[in-house]
């Protein structure tokens, strides 16, 4: 098996409504394979990160490696409302548990896509995907401007990397790399569950200057305040990387994750925030993490993940 697999385009199939012509197109009609030669016109490039090694190391429930394929299958039959090309750039795999190598391959792929003018949308995989995604953006920018990371997540994912990286360490790894480079670590974590993060993690977040909002404060009534806070954060940044850990959503909406949320944040709050981030014109890269098809119920979680893909790029 190749370490970077082109996806089987047969996954992109679904309903046909020929009686309605061009207005009845779905994703399976429009998603394009990556060209074998030459450059593709700038568009959205889907990249799968078929890896849950970080989840295993973090003592979570594995299965997220199957997420990229499952999300593609749900996207395939979704109605098409986009005005730019979408390409399937295949999957990065984690072979023999070598997460560092998988991170390196993802970073290389993301950087190259950015260099060629595309918007990479990475489909994880465990949240270890974040270090690979950010590393690609960091490589592409090469110090040009300040990067802000916005993470919708019930967890800070600021665990210290002792012997190995995991799904709990990506933002600590990024903070370490920023310190080495002498660049600011600008991180927002929105939807934090107090009971899912130790006092040590809250202290580390404070020491690193992380802007965080608890899940209980992320309600429709608080949306104006959230948008104001987001504006202040975005104003400090030249470029944005948005990462969505799907366990930020309520367990009833998102059962298919390793650590379902006891409370979570509603889509009615998250979607306007995504739209606001997009409207800033600074969003360069996004990813989804932690969807686990083996824990899903009637594809409920996959449908939500597919909806969020649409929200990220519409």
UniProtKB/Swiss-Prot annotation:
GO MF entries: agmatinase activity; formimidoylglutamase activity; manganese ion binding
Keyword Hydrolase appears in the UniProt entry: yes
InterPro entries: HutG, Ureohydrolase, Ureohydrolase_dom_sf, Ureohydrolase_Mn_BS
Cofactors demanded by this protein: Mn(2+)
Pfam family, any one: Arginase
Organism domain of life: Bacteria
Natural source organism: Aeromonas hydrophila subsp. hydrophila (strain ATCC 7966 / DSM 30187 / BCRC 13018 / CCUG 14551 / JCM 1027 / KCTC 2358 / NCIMB 9240 / NCTC 8049)
The reaction(s) this protein catalyses: N-formimidoyl-L-glutamate + H2O = formamide + L-glutamate
Similarity-based family: Belongs to the arginase family.
Positions of Mn(2+) 1 binding: 127, 153, 157, 245
Keywords: Histidine metabolism, Hydrolase, Manganese, Metal-binding
Record's protein name: Formimidoylglutamase
CDD domains assigned to the protein according to its UniProt record, in alphabetical order: Formimidoylglutamase
Transmembrane segments: none
Stated role: Catalyzes the conversion of N-formimidoyl-L-glutamate to L-glutamate and formamide.
Enzyme class: hydrolase
Signal sequence region: none
Enzyme Commission code(s) on record: 3.5.3.8
């Amino acid at each position: 098996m190749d370490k970077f697999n082109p996806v089987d385009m047969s996954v992109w199939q679904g309903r046909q409504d020929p009686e309605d012509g061009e207005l009845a197109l779905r994703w399976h009609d429009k998603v394009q394979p990556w060209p074998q030669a030459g450059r593709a016109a700038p568009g959205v490039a889907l990249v799968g990160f078929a890896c849950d090694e970080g989840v295993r190391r973090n003592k979570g429930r594995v299965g997220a490696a199957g997420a990229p394929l499952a999300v593609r299958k749900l996207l395939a039959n979704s109605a098409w409302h986009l005005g730019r090309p979408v390409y399937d750039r295949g999957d990065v795999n984690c072979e023999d548990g070598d997460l560092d190598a998988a991170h390196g391959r993802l970073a290389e792929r993301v950087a190259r896509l950015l260099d060629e003018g595309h918007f990479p949308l990475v489909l994880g995989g465990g949240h270890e995907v974040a270090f690979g995604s950010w590393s690609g953006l960091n490589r592409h920018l090469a110090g040009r401007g300040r990067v802000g990371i916005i993470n919708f997540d019930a967890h800070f994912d600021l665990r210290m990397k002792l012997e190995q990286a995991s799904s709990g360490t990506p933002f600590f790894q990024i903070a370490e790399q920023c310190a080495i480079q002498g660049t600011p670590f600008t991180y927002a974590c929105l939807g934090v569950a107090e009971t899912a993060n130790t006092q040590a993690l809250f202290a580390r977040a404070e020491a690193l200057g992380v802007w965080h909002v608890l899940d209980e404060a992320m309600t429709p009534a608080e949306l104006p305040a959230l948008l104001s806070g987001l504006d202040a954060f975005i104003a400090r940044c030249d470029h944005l990387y948005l990462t969505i850990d799907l366990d930020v959503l309520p367990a009833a909406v998102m059962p298919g994750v390793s650590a379902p949320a006891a409370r979570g944040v509603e889509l009615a709050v998250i979607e306007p925030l995504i739209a606001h981030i997009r409207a800033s014109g600074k969003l360069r890269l996004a990813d989804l993490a932690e969807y686990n098809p083996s824990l899903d119920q009637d594809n409920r979680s996959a449908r939500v993940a597919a909806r969020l893909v649409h929200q990220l790029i519409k």
